[in-house]
Amino acid sequence: MTPTQAAVAALKGRTNLINATTAELRKLLEEADRQILAILAAAPSDYQLWYLPQLQAEIRRVLVTLGSEAAGAVDVRQLEAWRTGAALVDQVVAAAGVRVVLPTLDVRQLTAMRAFLTGKIKDVALDVANAINSQLGLVVIGAQTPFEAIKAISALLKEATLKRGTTIVRTELARAYATANQIRMEQAAAVVPGLRKRWVKSGKREPRVTHVAIHGQEQPVAKPFVLEGGAVTMMYPHDPKAPARHTI
């Protein structure tokens, strides 16, 4: 396998990892939707008989479980993304015929990233719980029918929450991958003189125009990529120090 083939295979593996994680998130949200609809179906048909605190508590339990399970799932995948990002450097260097023994990555940054991601995922679940409470409240005061509330709640889970969760997962898994990749390259550069990195545009259907513009740009490992005519610099894709428009 050539260095280019090794890099292409690793990037494909990263994409598959992210897609598998978002699919897992979708399954968890669909299960939460089923459980919440079952709770609402068991409520009295006359909404005036609804005991709102009990309904809210039951739904909140479902969503707290969702948050914990989703956080656990993405945490495992984030670790895998971190390892894969580091392994890419090892594979490319080996494919070039260079034999090096590199130290284990310092995981302090990974630890912070894991805490951030699991916290964000749990926040998503709690935010949707509050939004659902608002929908139930509208029913109780007669502002909408139970049927309308059920439709709105399903939309919250299957559309808005899924979209937000997917954005977080894609961003943070890609960031873990790229961060580990950069750290590993810095280690390798200490023993492989002249090692350089290259910006490769993403495989998205609609990639950022500014990222497409620097496709193929090469820099020494310790130097940043230059975007927007020098107005923006990034050490790697999803660099947390870069403006949000370039990372989310």
Located regions from the model:
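Secretory-pathway/luminal and periplasmic proteins that interact with or process carbohydrate-rich
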Residues: 159-163, 178-179
